[in-house]
Amino acid sequence: MQAIKMYRMALDQIPSTQREVQFRIQRNIGNAFVRLGQFQNAIQSYERVQEVQADVQAAFNLVLCFFAMGDCERMRSSFKKLVAIPIEDPVGDSAHVVSGVDADSSDDDDDGDDDDDHDLRRRRYFESGTLETELESRRMRATEYITTAARLIAPVIEKESWIEGYEWIVKTLEKSQHSKIGSEMTIAKSLQYLKEKRFKEAIDVLKGFEKKEKDLMARAANNLSFLYFLEGDVEQADKYANVAVRTDR
């Protein structure tokens, strides 16, 4: 409780212009309440951050709190809010700006030198190690938070059946900008079938990846090879092992 008191004193000293610092302190207050097992107080701290700014870390922490409390309905609502937070695409942003500059320069050949200088400044702004790298780092952190939250709550959000929980997670992700994580969760669903020795269902799920992206297809083929090997079907096991090798070279 002493740490929380000190955090609140610090929060009172931070000017309103330094919102990022305020958010970090508010998140730390929530983290301290989590350590004390006071999840409702932690939720209030994280929600204060969310009210002002969509924050991936605070949204993820809310999912964890509702998971700890066993509140399935609020797990679903908080997960929806987490995946709805917009994540900037560094590749898309840089490509858009650079292509936009090229388009402008082609309109007026008389200003070619000025356009070249402007193009150079833009390229330096987006070169590796600057904004582009920071955006990529944020995207990777957001992906990790969302994937972890999805794996955590998928088996428990539907009390009647873990299968329905995975299906809800996959559908929610496919409707968002994180459809690839939805594919990851489909593979996780097949592994859950495997844990329960329901090989046929696991195989059916994995076969749906035969026309997907190469990295997902390779992983699915690798798992299919293993499943067929467990069932004693050496021919099919060899077939999918070769598919995995060819796809992931």
Question: For the regions a protein language model found, what residue spans apply to each?
Answer:
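Non-TPR docking regions that flank or precede TPR/alpha-solenoid scaffolds in eukaryotic proteins
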Residues: 1-249
